[in-house]
Amino acid sequence: MYAVIRTGGKQYRVAPGDVLKIETAAANQDGQIEFSEVLAFSGETGSVVKPGAAKVLASVEGEGRGDKILVFHYKRKKQYKKLQGHRQNFTQIRIQEIQIDGNSYRAQ
């Protein structure tokens, strides 16, 4: 049983109990995040969901920064070199529950 959600401009396939790193997201006071943009849902029958019919609840486990990515610009014969680094911020979450049409699917 899984769902496909969209957050941070990316799509993720999630199931109850999954741990994943997403783009930095704001959580509630109690550390919960609710994803209401569910694109697809697979249960016993597997189906595409109507907008607003399903939601995914997750809890925040931590925040951090990803590995450094180096960007190197170089122009030959001109002695031009520029090195720049980038570390993307992320939020680590654990999927607690998938709710659709009054039914709730939780992690075992």
UniProtKB/Swiss-Prot annotation:
**Keyword line:** Ribonucleoprotein, Ribosomal protein, RNA-binding, rRNA-binding
Q: Which domain of life does this protein belong to?
A: Bacteria
Q: Name one GO biological process term.
A: translation
Q: How does it assemble?
A: Part of the 50S ribosomal subunit. Contacts protein L20.
Q: Which family does it belong to?
A: Belongs to the bacterial ribosomal protein bL21 family.
Report the function annotation for this chain. Answer: This protein binds to 23S rRNA in the presence of protein L20.
Q: What is the protein name given in its UniProt record?
A: Large ribosomal subunit protein bL21
Q: What gene name does this entry carry? A: rplU
